[in-house]
Design a protein with these regions (language model features):
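Short glycine-/small-residue-rich flexible loop motifs, especially phosphate/cofactor-binding loops
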Residues: 19, 86, 126, 137, ...
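Short donor-sugar binding/catalytic loops of nucleotide-sugar-dependent glycosyltransferases
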Residues: 80, 102, 157-158
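Rossmann-fold NAD(P)-dependent oxidoreductase module
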Residues: 20, 110, 114, 163-167
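An N-terminal-biased, well-structured beta-alpha scaffold segment characteristic
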Residues: 2-97
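Phosphate-binding beta-alpha-beta segment of Rossmann-like dinucleotide-binding domains, i.e.
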Residues: 100-151
Length: 169
């Protein structure tokens, strides 16, 4: 029987993902969801085949350049990877991956939420309700403006703008 790859997951990931990791690999999860210390990450580099950090985990040259390291791949959870010293990973022949499109639709949804919140004064209304300042309905109070029939201007047409344009159609 082939031995499963040992992986260290540095933070809490979605349950379905963690379940899949546990069945596919010899996975160690961070059930406390606390940031691992530099010393713990260095030890992880020595003890695991793969390190699965998030964008909030600084994976520095000191961590990557650990002597007697076992890690061959760093699979970052998130679109960005500026938390990882890429030059150090290259020098140490460690593959670095990320999830570039994982947040495209989510970010487009948030952009739509912000547009609706501003146009319809949603955030302002929510603030009044939470602070028990809501005095009841009045015909023109907090009316805002409709987004229907408006023109949406998008600067650049990257992944997020394209997704937003599909929501807005």
């Amino acid at each position: 029987m082939m031995q499963k790859f040992k992986i260290l997951v540095t933070r809490k990931w979605p349950k379905k993902v963690e379940d899949k990791l546990l069945t596919t690999f010899d996975a160690t999860l961070n059930v406390e969801d606390r940031p691992l210390s530099e010393a713990e990450l260095v030890e992880g580099m020595k003890s695991y085949d793969a390190l699965l950090p998030t964008v909030t985990d600084p994976i520095t040259d000191k961590i990557i350049s650990t002597s007697n390291k076992k890690v061959k791949i760093i699979g970052n959870f998130g679109v960005g990877f500026n938390n990882i010293d890429i030059d150090s990973a290259k020098r140490n022949s460690i593959v670095v991956t990320n999830t570039p499109e994982v947040l495209t639709d989510c970010t487009a949804d948030i952009a739509m939420l912000l547009m609706l919140g501003v146009a319809r004064r949603g955030s302002e209304g929510e603030f009044h309700v939470r602070n028990k300042e809501w005095t009841g309905w009045r015909p023109t109070h907090m009316m805002g403006t409709k987004v229907t029939g408006k023109t949406l201007g998008l600067i650049g047409m990257g992944r997020i703008a394209q997704a937003l344009s599909l929501i807005h159609i």
